[in-house]
Amino acid sequence: LSGAFDLLTELERHAPQALPLVASEMVRIAQQVGQLGRAREVLQRSYTGHPSVDIADALVQADVADGMPLRDAREGYVRHMAVEPSLIAASRWLSQEPFAQDGAHAVVQRSVEEAVRPLARYRCAACGFEAQGYFWQCPGCQAWDSFPPRRIEEL
């Protein structure tokens, strides 16, 4: 796993635009190989240059893995929304926010998640095909490298 982590950190130099695609996995592997601090540094540098909800999410994940209470770590979503307005970040922040009316939380959260779902997809620049995951080759038109490595919300 150490080799996998090293390869993922090389994306910062060779393909920084692709780092959001693997940010969460980088944190997971970093935690297993004891490199959480290094992963956080790489992600923070990338985020500073190219703010992304996926990197913000991975930074929150890294903070929690490093022992920060989720209540404090999720402030990363608020900081992201201050830089880049994001319904995806708002949804993730809201999912852990206590409501005065317990019964309302599930209904509101489900509504927000449904509204956010289309924004969290990736879209082929050639044909407009949308997918929940990133593809090197579009399943719709078969074009290669036609998916920008950013979610629809961030385009």
Q: What are these language model-derived features?
A:
Residues 15-16, 25, 36:
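Long amphipathic alpha-helical segments with strong coiled-coil/leucine-zipper propensity
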Residues 40, 53-56:
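Extended, charged alpha-helical interaction scaffolds
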Residues 1-12, 35-49, 68-83, 102-115:
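Alpha-helical repeat scaffolds
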Residues 21-25, 58-59, 87-94:
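"A position-specific structural signal for the A-helix of alpha-solenoid helical repeats
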Residues 76-155:
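Cys/His-clustered metal-coordination modules, chiefly Zn-binding fingers
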Residues 29-30, 59-65, 93-99:
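Residue at a conserved register position within TPR or TPR-like alpha-solenoid repeats
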Residues 21-22, 38, 119:
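Alpha-helix N-cap/N′ positions at the starts of helices
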Residues 16-17, 51, 85:
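Helix-capping and short linker residues that terminate individual alpha-solenoid repeat units
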